Swiss-Prot record:
InterPro entries: UBR7, UBR7-like_UBR-box, Zinc_finger_PHD-type_CS, Znf_FYVE_PHD, Znf_PHD, Znf_PHD-finger, Znf_RING/FYVE/PHD, Znf_UBR. It comes from Dictyostelium discoideum. This is Putative E3 ubiquitin-protein ligase ubr7. Residues 12-21 have a biased composition (Polar residues). Putative E3 ubiquitin-protein ligase. A zinc finger (PHD-type) spans 237-293. Pathway: Protein modification; protein ubiquitination. The keyword Metal-binding applies. A zinc finger (UBR-type) spans 100-174. Residues 1-47, 183-202 are annotated as: Disordered. Residues 1-11 have a biased composition (Basic and acidic residues).
Length: 465
């Protein structure tokens, strides 16, 4: 507390004046943008019973030179602990996957993805890996948590890490019995060739999605490239239009198309609205770049949710182009004209995907744009819904503060409870005296002052005995 500053805000009533301190001495420093434990400071997607935008962050922040009272500092600390507890509860509900296996053999799936800053020092190629590899192969590395990525296959130990020949995936080839069927996912039908080190691989056609059945151990993972994986600046630990590292104090919203994360303030600057809807008022965000690449969405004005004169406006469901008939032969937007519009971010209303046309012609557009995922069910949401309330109650993180209160009231005799409360009250009064003295003299409270304070407090405690 060397930098603690005392300011006389009310010289006529020094006894009622609380000491003023700078935030830098009290507010806990934010975690770094990289983590060595993939679940410690991870933040999660908000999930409720209603469709809702993916949002992370949301911590209160103060300016570095802001002057606050001790009460405000304590309130900030309590708020910080509350936020961390809520975050831990949300983390517990996340389906991170099995940390004992690598998901490479499951193919291109929706999963939590991580990137490694440490490995990037020796390899300028972008790559990502699954939760299992983050807990084994990269456990002691600086790891970026990228949250959920769609249709992504684990890169750990593949050819993309070729410059680092000494690195091997520790979980390669480790499968559970019920995962054996997933080996078929090694090569998707969209891949035309596969490089293997053996000549004994048997190729068979099993279904429309996968062409190759590969037995465990019959391929060399280090010679395979995941050509269908998509990489962006998230894999460098950067997010948003501003290309900044993750800051846990700022709210970020995920675009459903590119799966990048955007700061609320940056969205306000980039969008054509002065404010953005709150999380419960819109379902998904489509960033301006993705909207410009998928302009067919402009044919559906009824999916929009935006703010006008401080009121949430939902697009009209009964527009002329909309047809409630979902027949594959009838196009909802036939004859519609896309009018060039100002570049902006699109906030979509609840159940907006149901408004999209499902005729054969439109389905070809979706396939060409590679946005067929819009019609797929969210596997993660289904898993969370299937998780019972009892499981959540049994496994939820413990509120340490509440647990301490419970232990205090149940285990300590009334006499000891009174002694502790009196001791705390005595310390509080003596702190006020110290602050008032420093305030009268307009002096800064130093580390030595605090050390002397506790020495005197212990001496007085002995005399009382």
């Amino acid at each position: 507390m060397d930098n603690e500053k005392v300011t006389d805000t009310n010289p006529k009533e020094p006894s009622n004046v609380e000491s003023i301190i700078t935030t830098s001495e009290v507010t806990p420093s934010p975690p770094p943008s990289t983590t060595t434990s993939t679940t410690t400071n991870a933040t999660t997607t908000i999930t409720t019973s209603q469709p809702q935008a993916n949002i992370i962050g949301g911590k209160r922040s103060r300016k570095d030179d802001e002057i606050i009272s001790i009460q405000e500092a304590l309130n900030d600390q309590l708020e910080e602990e509350k936020n961390l507890l809520e975050e831990a509860k949300e983390q517990e509900q996340e389906d991170w996957g099995d940390e004992s296996i690598c998901t490479f053999d499951k193919g291109y799936i929706n999963q939590s993805v991580f990137a490694c800053k440490t490995c990037q020092l020796s390899n300028d190629k972008l790559f990502g890996f699954c939760y299992g590899c983050s807990m084994h192969c990269h456990l002691y590395h600086d790891v970026y948590e990228l949250f959920n990525k769609r249709n992504f296959r684990c890169d750990c130990g593949t050819k993309i890490q070729e410059p680092n020949n000494s690195f091997k995936c520790q979980l390669s080839g480790i499968l559970k019995e019920d995962d054996n069927n997933n080996v078929n996912n090694i090569n998707n039908s969209n891949n035309t060739t596969t490089t293997t080190t053996t000549t004994t691989t048997t190729t068979t056609t099993t279904n429309n999605n996968h062409l190759n059945d590969i037995d465990i151990g019959s391929y060399d993972k280090s010679q395979i490239l995941n050509e269908r994986n998509h990489y962006n600046h998230n894999f460098k630990g950067k997010y948003c239009y501003c290309d900044s590292p993750y800051d846990y104090k700022e709210d970020m919203i995920q675009c459903i198309f590119c799966e990048d994360w955007f700061h609320e303030n940056c969205l306000k600057l980039n969008s054509n609205v002065t404010d953005i809807p709150s999380p419960g008022e819109f379902s998904d965000l489509i960033c301006a770049d993705c909207l410009s690449k998928n302009q067919f969405l402009l044919l559906y004005p009824q999916i929009r949710c935006y703010i006008e004169n401080d009121h949430i406006i939902i697009g009209d469901n009964n527009n002329n182009n909309n047809n409630s008939n979902n027949s594959n032969s009838i196009c909802k937007v036939e004859g519609g004209v896309i009018t060039p519009n100002k570049k902006y971010d699109l906030f979509c209303k609840e159940l907006w995907k149901d408004e999209l046309c499902s005729c054969l012609k439109c389905k070809e557009i979706y396939k060409d744009k590679k946005v067929e995922f819009l019609f797929e069910k969210d596997e993660n949401s289904l898993k969370k819904k299937n998780k019972t309330v009892d499981e959540n109650l049994d496994n939820k993180p413990v509120n340490v503060f509440e647990m301490g209160q419970d232990v205090f009231s149940k285990t300590l005799p009334p006499t000891q409870q009174r002694a502790l409360i009196e001791g705390f009250s005595d310390m509080k009064e003596k702190l006020k005296e110290l602050f008032s003295k420093k305030l009268d003299k307009n002096q800064v409270i130093t580390k030595q002052d605090i050390q002397s304070f506790f020495v005197d407090l212990n001496v007085n405690k002995k005399f009382k005995k």
